[in-house]
């Protein structure tokens, strides 16, 4: 589901900078990658889960297991596992000995798109609100707990994903070792609008509008150097390829 919070990808670049210090250690660590579709309690809805960990390692303590979830616009895969200079944020964390997972909630990335997404957005109410996202996130948590034989894990949300993991943790505290809130969307420097626009089932975002949002509020003399050459194009290509209808909309 391509929506409006287009700054997530820019935050991905910032996160990559945060983990630059891990690069040397990550360089020679071989990782195992597994992609899985897991069922939910709703008929026909499956969730995409990716796992990366050091090759040959199958036992992990709860404090070494991490599940990440995306924000309101783009899927986890291209926010958390897009290689920049050869490594993604997910790669760098896994290379430090972590068992790292990402999940796309329904309607995003490779996860099942609800049938309402085949209809015009104005025909239905929002279909993936925070309560639904938290439910899907919990499905992924339970999958990992069972797979690794542990009782709790670390969880991380990005942007709107902080609301998802925050809600989940408030109701399932015993299953969470540590809660990481990265770039919470409720931290604002301007007052909210007096009236929010009416939302449909989903929202559409173009590549041009995504780039514009990345560069919003950036001083003109800084814009040319903000995004490394080719990074936006690589991210946009990978992101829009996750939407099977992006070419025809």
PLM regions and their residue ranges:
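Bacterial N-terminal signal peptides that target proteins for export
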Residues: 1-10
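N-terminal cap/lid segment of alpha/beta-hydrolase-fold proteins
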Residues: 27-61
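Short, surface-exposed "cap/lid" segments of acyl-processing enzymes
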Residues: 56-102
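Glycine-rich "HGGG/HGxG" loop immediately N-terminal to the catalytic nucleophile
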Residues: 76-79, 103-125
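Alpha/beta-hydrolase active-site loop
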Residues: 121-148
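Conserved hydrolase catalytic core segment
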Residues: 148-187
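Alpha/beta-hydrolase
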Residues: 190-249
């Amino acid at each position: 589901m391509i929506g409006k919070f287009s700054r997530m990808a820019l935050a991905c670049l910032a996160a990559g900078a945060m983990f630059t210090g891990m690069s040397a250690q990550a360089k020679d660590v071989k990782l195992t990658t597994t992609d899985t579709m897991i069922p939910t309690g709703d008929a026909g809805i499956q969730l995409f889960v990716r796992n990366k960990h050091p090759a040959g390692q199958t036992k992990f303590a709860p404090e070494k297991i991490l599940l990440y979830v995306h924000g309101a616009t783009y899927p986890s895969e291209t926010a958390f596992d897009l290689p920049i200079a050869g490594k993604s944020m997910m790669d760098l964390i896994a290379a430090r000995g972590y068992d790292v997972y990402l999940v796309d909630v329904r309607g995003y990335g490779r996860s099942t798109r609800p049938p309402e997404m085949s209809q015009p957005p104005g025909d239905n109410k929002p279909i993936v609100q925070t309560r639904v996202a938290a439910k899907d996130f919990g499905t992924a948590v339970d999958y990992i707990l069972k797979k690794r034989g542990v009782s709790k894990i670390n969880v991380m949300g990005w942007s709107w994903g902080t609301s998802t993991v925050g809600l989940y943790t408030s109701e399932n505290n015993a299953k969470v070792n540590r809660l990481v809130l990265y770039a919470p969307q409720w931290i604002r420097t301007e007052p909210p609008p007096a009236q929010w626009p009416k939302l449909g089932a989903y929202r559409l975002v173009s590549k041009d509008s995504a780039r514009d949002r990345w560069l919003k509020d950036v001083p003109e003399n800084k814009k040319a150097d903000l995004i490394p050459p080719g990074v936006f194009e690589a991210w946009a290509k990978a992101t829009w390829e996750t939407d099977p209808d992006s070419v025809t909309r």
